[in-house]
Amino acid sequence: MALRFLGIDPNTGDQGSPTVWLDDETGDLVIQSYKADAATLAACAEVGSVPGHSTDVPEHETVVRLPGYMLQFFPKP
């Protein structure tokens, strides 16, 4: 895996904070951010996605909350 650092929360201290990397081999974004709280998970389940798709988050997935200002680090197509 060839990750390339894209950006970190500019207001970060020396503890964990939102960070974005790009996997140059797959084009995937790898994101470190805040765990979604129970209210956010419930809202995701209520809104859903496509008809008939489960609203449960499988064990191999998670939901994170990325602050909007971190979008500045996402590559433009």
Predicted feature descriptions by range:
Residues 1-18:
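Short, charged/polar N-terminal "headpieces" of proteins
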Residues 3, 28, 63:
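A residue-level signal for beta-strand positions that form part of recognition/binding surfaces
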Residues 7-10, 24, 33-35, 68-70:
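Generic secondary-structure microfeatures
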Residues 14-56:
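A short, structured beta-strand/loop element
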Residues 42-77:
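Helix-rich interaction surfaces within compact, conserved domain-sized segments
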